[in-house]
């Protein structure tokens, strides 16, 4: 039942917009970046993640270093974002230059699976003590989230780069494909694995 429901899910999306300006307070050329999160209706009960940090990773031609866009935890149920946007980052100034990746540091999460009787729930969490669990929740099994809390979830940008130039506006849509991002581990371990499938594209005018 759960696998069938997953296949019917639409994607979630991170929406990025960037607008360059002449200079920042220090005289460096810079732009602005905003992030929002959205999802379309689906049948899965809950798919909750905590995004601890979001940052842009410069490419080899950019000496500006890593740019942190979000540095405070945001916990979101992807399935509540039906036909709407959730603001994550609002107009953060970023230095002019070229960036090769967007990274999301995901510190934890859980899945709630509807039982065959449609009333019971099975919960698979990254940790039994995950702070995003609802009060009184009984964890059925493990949701594996390999290395996302350390190196961050890597999202390659269109043409392998995002360039912010003088007086330029750039928009990107990053699709979080929920249907392909969660799966049950092989064998009888009872574990679920989070392997996010994210793609970054420029929206069609």
Describe these PLM feature segments.
Residues 1-10:
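Bacterial N-terminal signal peptides that target proteins for export
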Residues 22-205:
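A short, solvent-exposed, low-complexity linear motif enriched for acidic/polar residues
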Residues 16-20:
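C-terminal motif of bacterial Sec signal peptides marking the signal peptidase cleavage site
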């Amino acid at each position: 039942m759960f696998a069938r429901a997953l296949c019917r899910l639409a994607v979630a999306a991170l929406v990025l917009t960037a607008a360059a300006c002449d200079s920042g307070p220090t005289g460096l050329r810079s732009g602005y970046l905003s992030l929002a999160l959205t999802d379309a209706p689906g049948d899965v009960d809950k798919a909750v993640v905590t995004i601890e940090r979001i940052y842009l990773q410069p490419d080899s031609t950019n000496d500006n270093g890593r740019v942190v866009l979000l540095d405070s935890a945001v916990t979101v149920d992807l399935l509540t974002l039906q036909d709407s946007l959730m603001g994550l980052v609002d107009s953060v100034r970023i230095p002019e230059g070229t960036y090769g990746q967007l990274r999301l540091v995901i510190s934890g999460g859980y899945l709630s699976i509807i039982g065959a009787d449609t009333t019971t729930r099975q919960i698979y969490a990254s940790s039994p003590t995950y702070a995003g669990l609802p009060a009184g929740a009984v964890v059925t099994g493990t949701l594996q989230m390999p290395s996302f809390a350390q190196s961050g979830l890597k999202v390659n940008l269109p043409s392998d780069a995002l360039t912010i130039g003088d007086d330029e506006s750039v928009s990107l849509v990053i699709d979080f494909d929920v249907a392909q991002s969660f799966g049950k581990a092989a064998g009888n371990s009872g574990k679920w694995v989070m392997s996010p499938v994210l793609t970054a594209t420029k929206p069609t005018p």
